[in-house]
Amino acid sequence: MQLLIDMVVNEMPPKRKMIYKLSRIKGLSNEQIAEKLGIQKKTVENHLNIALNELRDALALSILVYLILSV
């Protein structure tokens, strides 16, 4: 599963990838990320929402493919 996450994250636009990594890997809050990057907190939230939706969709698709192939 980590390989799938890494693949999806690597395909993200640079700013979204950076925000995701600062949040999930470095553990920074949305406020800290916004301050560090000089952007609005809402922008950080939007990027994280999109990133998590992309990861969720990729995981759902991989589970579906696995289930279809295992029948």
Where do the model's predicted regions map?
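Short, Lys/Arg-enriched N-terminal segment that forms or immediately precedes the first helix
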Residues: M1-V8
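Helix-turn-helix DNA-binding module
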Residues: N10, P14, M18, K26-T43
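Short linear motifs centered on Gly/Pro in flexible linkers and helix caps
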Residues: Q2, K42-E45
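Residues within the DNA-recognition helix of helix-turn-helix
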Residues: L4, H47-I50
